[in-house]
Amino acid sequence: MTVNVAVLGAGSWGTILANLLVENGHHVELWGNDPEKVAEINEQHTNKHYLPEFKIDSRLHATLDLNEAFEAVDVVLFVIPTQVIRLVAEQIAPVLEAKGVKPVIVTASKGLEQGSHKRISEVLTETIPADIRNGIVVLSGPSHAEDVAMKDITTLTAASTDLVQAQWIQEIFMNDYFRLYTNTDVIGVEMGAALKNVIALGAGALHGLGYGDNTKAALMTRGLAEISRLGVAMGANPLTFIGLSGVGDLIVTGTSVHSRNWRTGNALGEGQKLDDVLENMGMVVEGVATCKAAYELAQQRSVDMPITNAIYNVLYRGCDIRTEIGNLMQRSGKPEIDFK
């Protein structure tokens, strides 16, 4: 079965997922908005800014033209920064309607929209009418593009309220090194995917400050607890957070030098300024915007998220990291398991 896929976003993850789908035998159009990058992918079969050592399959075609990308399309895969998803979705909706296609919409982006605090699937539901899409599937889990490029074994979750569509996406992506599981808890999968980026900033900061494994383990474990609290308050199944999109994604993002969020936190821990770190990164660090959304959402829902609050204070109020750590340690005693 050959499927026509349009991948939106020619960054590291978008390029790798597009390449994987081509290798799985599907026809893929990779849409980007940078003419030089699109030309590089088509002519040199590289994307050196994001994947310096990776050779792209010559069958993968990149394009600047949404009309070309959506020709007879079966799947539209969003792999773009969270804060521009609404804008791009609003642009593609009339193109899909004009083409007369009704694809499955898949998102592999991870974050919460600033201002509205909405999950990505909620944004897509609002911007792409139901009569021009065939369901929405969330793709999430512990996955760095660099590892998938090396064909390291990787497992993700395909989540949808429509299990049949999740199973179809599962079939399209799976091969001998890339395995998907299905889940119907879209809220839990998306909340875990978004919020782990915030905790990864903290984990990186601890490393930059010179803290050891005990401290990092404490932060990640208690970070998962508050991710779960907010997720459950939003309607998620608490068991989702011990799965791939919860603890799995938190482990890989909170411990790896491949993680932009971890690297950003590490640089902050070493004493660098946030604006300088983000400028030098040259790529979107989702956890920074998501931290603000998570902080505001927790305030609205009266959910206790002390680690997220501390990271927010560092990012948005200029507070000292060590002072925030001290404040966390001076809190009154609490039960370990508490979803309130």
UniProtKB/Swiss-Prot annotation:
The keyword NAD applies. Its EC number is 1.1.1.94. GO terms for molecular function: glycerol-3-phosphate dehydrogenase [NAD(P)+] activity; NAD binding. Its main location: cytoplasm. It is found in: Cytoplasm. It catalyses: sn-glycerol 3-phosphate + NAD(+) = dihydroxyacetone phosphate + NADH + H(+); sn-glycerol 3-phosphate + NADP(+) = dihydroxyacetone phosphate + NADPH + H(+). PROSITE patterns: NAD_G3PDH. Pfam families: NAD_Gly3P_dh_C, NAD_Gly3P_dh_N. GO terms for cellular component: cytosol. Pathway: Membrane lipid metabolism; glycerophospholipid metabolism. NADPH binds at S12, W13, K110, A145, R260, V284, E286. Catalyzes the reduction of the glycolytic intermediate dihydroxyacetone phosphate (DHAP) to sn-glycerol 3-phosphate (G3P), the key precursor for phospholipid synthesis. This is Glycerol-3-phosphate dehydrogenase [NAD(P)+]. It comes from Latilactobacillus sakei subsp. sakei (strain 23K) (Lactobacillus sakei subsp. sakei).
